């Protein structure tokens, strides 16, 4: 399912317009990204948590040439699945 399909499905179930739903989803995603970018964690109980994690500097390797490279420390966004989400997926499996 892509974003437009999600918008259509939510609009169908809630009877709100697709335009309103798109604004809400776009705003929600922007807020999550901006919040995680500042170092804060965003938790949606039962669904999961978004946060940025520190990645230490390390030595890497160019897969094409085999040359060793230095990879500097960085922050990467992560998502941890909530219990309700995990259990729902496992039940339908």
Curated annotation (Swiss-Prot):
Molecular function in Gene Ontology: DNA binding; structural constituent of chromatin
GO term, biological process aspect, one: chromosome condensation
Stored Pfam families: Bac_DNA_binding
Protein localization: Plastid, Chloroplast
Keywords: Chloroplast, DNA condensation, DNA-binding, Plastid
GO annotations of cellular component type: chloroplast
UniProt record similarity statement: Belongs to the bacterial histone-like protein family.
Function: Histone-like DNA-binding protein which is capable of wrapping DNA to stabilize it, and thus to prevent its denaturation under extreme environmental conditions.
Name of the protein this chain belongs to: DNA-binding protein HU homolog
């Amino acid at each position: 399912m892509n974003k437009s399909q999600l918008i259509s499905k939510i609009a169908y179930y809630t009877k709100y317009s697709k335009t309103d739903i798109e604004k809400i989803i776009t705003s929600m995603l922007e807020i999550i990204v901006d919040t995680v970018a500042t170092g804060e964690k965003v938790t949606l109980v039962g669904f999961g948590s978004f946060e940025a994690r520190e990645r230490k500097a390390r030595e890497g390797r160019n897969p094409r040439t085999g040359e060793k490279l230095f990879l500097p420390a960085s922050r990467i966004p992560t998502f941890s699945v909530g219990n309700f989400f995990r259990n729902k997926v496992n039940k339908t499996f």
